[in-house]
C-alpha cells in the first residue's frame, strides 16, 4: 500500500511538471498594472437605462453578479509585432480594449483555428474559462487595456498547453 501511495504521488508530480513544460508562455509582451482592488463582499450591480425615451422597449442593461470576494485588475499590455500571449485562460471575465494596433485571437475549442480580428478602438469580452491565444500579426505594436474580474487571490492568467488546432 505504501508503495502504491509513493507511485501515485510520483506520477502526480511528474504530470504537474509535464503540464508546466507544455505551457506556451507569452513572447514580446510587456505588461503594466494600472490598478488592482479587492472587493471583499459579493457584487450585485444592475442597471437599466432607457436609451430611447419615446419607445417603451429600448433599454440598455448590464448585470454584474459575484459570490465571494473578488479582485479587479486593470492592466495595459504592449505586444510587439510577431508577439503573442501564448495559450492561456482566465478564472473570470475580462473586458479588453484594443488601444492601438490589431489583435487577432484564436480559440482552442475551434478545430478550424478561425482568426478573430479586433481593430484599434474596438473591444471584446473574454468570458473566462476558455483556452485562447492573442497574437499581434501586424507590423506595429498592439496595445490593449484589460479589466479583469477574478476570484480574490487567484492569478488572472493560467498558462495552458498548445491545443494543437492551429499550425503556429
List PLM regions with ranges.
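Short acidic-glycine-tyrosine-enriched beta hairpin
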Residues: 79, 109-129
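Histidine-centered divalent metal-coordination motifs
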Residues: 88-90, 132
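Glycine- and acidic-residue-biased ligand/ion/polar-headgroup-sensing regions
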Residues: 90-111, 120
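A short, N-terminal "cap"/entry segment at the start of jelly-roll beta-barrel domains
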Residues: 4-7, 13-71, 115-117, 161-168
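Ligand-binding loop in jelly-roll beta-barrel domains
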Residues: 119, 128-155
Amino acid at each position: 500500500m505504501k508503495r502504491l501511495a509513493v507511485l501515485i504521488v510520483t506520477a502526480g508530480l511528474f504530470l504537474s511538471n509535464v503540464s508546466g513544460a507544455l505551457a506556451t508562455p507569452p513572447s514580446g509582451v510587456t505588461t503594466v498594472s494600472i490598478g488592482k482592488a479587492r472587493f471583499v463582499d459579493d457584487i450585485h450591480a444592475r442597471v437599466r437605462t432607457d436609451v430611447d425615451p419615446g419607445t417603451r422597449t429600448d433599454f440598455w442593461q448590464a448585470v454584474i453578479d459575484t459570490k465571494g470576494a473578488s479582485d479587479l485588475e486593470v492592466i495595459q499590455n504592449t505586444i510587439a509585432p510577431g508577439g503573442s500571449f501564448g495559450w492561456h485562460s482566465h478564472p473570470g471575465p475580462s473586458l479588453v480594449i484594443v488601444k492601438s494596433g490589431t489583435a487577432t485571437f484564436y480559440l482552442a475549442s475551434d478545430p478550424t483555428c478561425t482568426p478573430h480580428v479586433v481593430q484599434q478602438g474596438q473591444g471584446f469580452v473574454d468570458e473566462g474559462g476558455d483556452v485562447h491565444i492573442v497574437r499581434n500579426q501586424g507590423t506595429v505594436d498592439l496595445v490593449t487595456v484589460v479589466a479583469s474580474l477574478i476570484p480574490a487571490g487567484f492569478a488572472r492568467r493560467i498558462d495552458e498547453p498548445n491545443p494543437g488546432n492551429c499550425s503556429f
